A protein has these predicted regions:
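A short, N-terminal "cap"/entry segment at the start of jelly-roll beta-barrel domains
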Residues: 1-30, 44
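Double-stranded beta-helix
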Residues: 2-4, 9-12, 94, 98-129
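Short beta-strand His + acidic residue motifs that chelate non-heme Fe in jelly-roll/DSBH
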Residues: 19, 45, 64-65, 87, ...
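Conserved short histidine dyad/triad with adjacent acidic residue
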Residues: 33-50
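Tight coil/turn sites that cap or link beta-strands
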Residues: 37-40, 82, 88-90, 100
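A generic "binding-loop/recognition-motif" signal
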Residues: 50, 83, 91, 99, ...
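Glycine- and acidic-residue-biased ligand/ion/polar-headgroup-sensing regions
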Residues: 50-63
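Short acidic-glycine-tyrosine-enriched beta hairpin
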Residues: 69-89
């Protein structure tokens, strides 16, 4: 399993401030979320069967442990501010906040409480913690 880390593809700075283009592609996101977590918080330890996600750090640092639900393959990456990664279907993910931080989460599907597409699976068991 390989998880490339994405950085902004474009940045413009002028007298008004800074503008970063995070992704420029043909993805269509149905859910856009902003979050803020404390140091030591863990998100995830689950996977999705149909949803594709893009997780992007705005501030702070995280470690993400991946475990593929079908193959058992593992991967671990760290993200710093202005870095992001795709979370593909069947990839269980445990996102550990190494610092307090803010993030953006884009989802290919809106959350449906009647059919949540969330399946518990600890990705950080036996990992590098």
């Amino acid at each position: 399993m390989n998880h490339p880390v994405f950085k902004p593809s474009f940045a413009r700075t002028d007298a008004r401030g800074v503008f970063h283009e995070i992704r420029n592609g043909d993805e269509i996101w149905k859910s856009v979320n902003l979050g803020e977590m404390r140091q030591g918080a863990v998100l995830g330890n689950h996977y999705h069967t149909t949803s594709r996600l893009f997780f992007f750090m705005l501030s702070g640092k995280v470690r993400i442990d991946f475990l593929h639900a079908k193959t058992g393959e593992r991967d671990t990456i760290e993200l710093n501010p202005l870095e992001g990664v795709y979370l593909e279907p069947y990839e269980s993910h445990a996102i550990l906040f190494l610092d307090s931080g803010r993030f953006m989460l884009l989802k290919s599907e809106a959350f449906n409480p009647k059919k949540p597409d969330i399946y518990p699976l600890k990705a950080d068991e036996g990992g590098s913690r």
